[in-house]
Amino acid sequence: MSRSGVAVADESIQAFNDLKLGMKYKFVLFSLNDAKTEIVVKETSSDPSYDAFLEKLPENDCLYAVYDFEYQISESEGKRSKIVFFTWSPDTASVRPKMVYASSKDALKRALNGVAIEIQGTDFSEVSYEAVLEKVSRGAGSH
C-alpha cells in the first residue's frame, strides 16, 4: 500500500515476473484503475522495437512502465539487458493524476524486484533511446 492508499494488483506483479523471468514480454504498461485504488496492467507487448514502446506513452496522461532494455557497450562485450522502470508524467497531464502517480510510485517499485534503473519522464526527450542508453550504460564496463 502506498502513501496514497493505492495497492498493487497481483496481475501487475505477475506481468512483471513474466517479463523478468519468462521473457514473455518486452514491456509492460501499468496504470491506476478507474477508482484510483489499484495499479493494474494496462498493456503488455513482446514487440522488440523501442519506438513501439514510446508510441504507447500518452501525450497527456500518466502511467508506469517496465521495459527490458537491451544494449551493447562494445563489440567485445556483447549484448546486455537491464530492466528499466519508467514513471511517465508528461508536463501536459493534469495536476491531480501527476500527484497520485508520484505518491503511488514507491508501492509499485517495491513490488517489482529486479528493476535496475529508474527513469522519470516528463517529455519524450527524457525517455529517448539515447537518454536511457546513457543511464543504463553509466558505470557498466567499469567493474
Swiss-Prot record:
It is found in: Cytoplasm; Cytoplasm, Cytoskeleton; Nucleus matrix. GO terms for molecular function: actin filament binding. Keywords: Actin-binding, Cell cycle, Cell division, Cytoplasm, Cytoskeleton, Nucleus. SUPFAM superfamilies: Actin depolymerizing proteins. InterPro entries: ADF-H, ADF-H/Gelsolin-like_dom_sf, ADF/Cofilin. Residues 5-137 form the ADF-H domain. Controls reversibly actin polymerization and depolymerization in a pH-sensitive manner. It has the ability to bind G- and F-actin in a 1:1 ratio of cofilin to actin. Binding to F-actin is regulated by tropomyosin. It is the major component of intranuclear and cytoplasmic actin rods. Required for accumulation of actin at the cell division site via depolymerizing actin at the cell ends. In association with myosin II has a role in the assembly of the contractile ring via severing actin filaments. Involved in the maintenance of the contractile ring once formed. This is Cofilin. It comes from Candida glabrata (strain ATCC 2001 / BCRC 20586 / JCM 3761 / NBRC 0622 / NRRL Y-65 / CBS 138) (Yeast). The lineage of its organism: Eukaryota, Fungi, Dikarya, Ascomycota, Saccharomycotina.
